[in-house]
Amino acid sequence: MQGIDVSYSDEVGFLTKGDRDWEDWIMQLLLMAKKEIGKDNAQEMSINFVDEDRSQAINRDYRDKDRPTDVISFAIEDGDDGLDLSMFTQDPDFTEDIGDLFMCPSVIERHSKEYGTGFDREFGYTIVHGYLHLNCYDHIEPDEAKEMFGIQGKVLEEYGLPLYPDQLDEGRGK
């Protein structure tokens, strides 16, 4: 399995907080999710850490929801346009640009307290959730939600950040 090239923009200084190597931690979760969905080709993406004002502006402008949110994903390929990229992904030199994530650490922190999950589990949930959206997974329909949340749960459990059993249907939250 080839890797994921992640470029970062950190408007809030998140990556320098604490003594954790956030980029390494994020990469471990992304690679586990990539393996779980069976993606073998090289990928590239960006992760942008933003404040609540920027998160709210993006959410309002692109999703018509006037509130900050934990993660917003802009997938290059959403699966709805009928493009078959398989011929490209077989080329060992091809790197698939899957898109961009905009993450708001302060909203993730608030959610971790509201849901009683702890920051690490909530952050892990959010990064895997966003990554799956960039790979054409969604949770609008119940069967899609079951598949997507099942993948998230498996990845988080394997990493040591399990979803609680009562969260599997709704994805998170008690």
Swiss-Prot record:
Protein name: Endoribonuclease YbeY
Keywords associated with the record: Cytoplasm, Endonuclease, Hydrolase, Metal-binding, Nuclease, Ribosome biogenesis, rRNA processing, Zinc
Co-factor binding comment: Binds 1 zinc ion.
Superkingdom of the organism of origin: Bacteria
EC number: 3.1.-.-
Entry keyword annotation includes Signal: no
One GO-annotated biological process of the protein: rRNA processing
MF term (GO), any: zinc ion binding
UniProt-listed InterPro entries: MetalPrtase_cat_dom_sf_prd, YbeY
Primary location recorded for the protein, binned into one broad class: cytoplasm
Binding residue positions for Zn(2+): 129, 133, 139
One annotated Gene Ontology cellular component of this protein: cytoplasm
Stated role: Single strand-specific metallo-endoribonuclease involved in late-stage 70S ribosome quality control and in maturation of the 3' terminus of the 16S rRNA.
Family affiliation: Belongs to the endoribonuclease YbeY family.
Protein's cellular compartments: Cytoplasm
Entry cofactors: Zn(2+)
